[in-house]
């Protein structure tokens, strides 16, 4: 099923992307024309980014970066996104990112579970991790940060 089959016509369309806002569980979904090769857990092309409101504690950024380079956190906007080739893989990536942030899984365990679950998906098996978000997107997630005290004088 394509994004248009599931979510209808995009809210925005440019030469390089299609954008849907507030579609299903997502704050935003973007399908990019530019393909980004990605080899975890197996070679594929990342083209579909999906975004949720989510505040990641600063001390968890390195763990998320080690877990999956296609999971991106924007601290200022309070967003976390996954970019893959299938919506199910984006659900999986974000669900496991939540598991890493909350301490339910280690980085290594999350990577192993991701690889096994994607392999199962390719063989026609499903998992609750592929079917939807297993956490609630947050509210008031933006972090405006602050200027150093030395600049406040």
Report the location of each language-model feature:
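Non-cytosolic coordination micro-motifs
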Residues: 1-28, 32-153
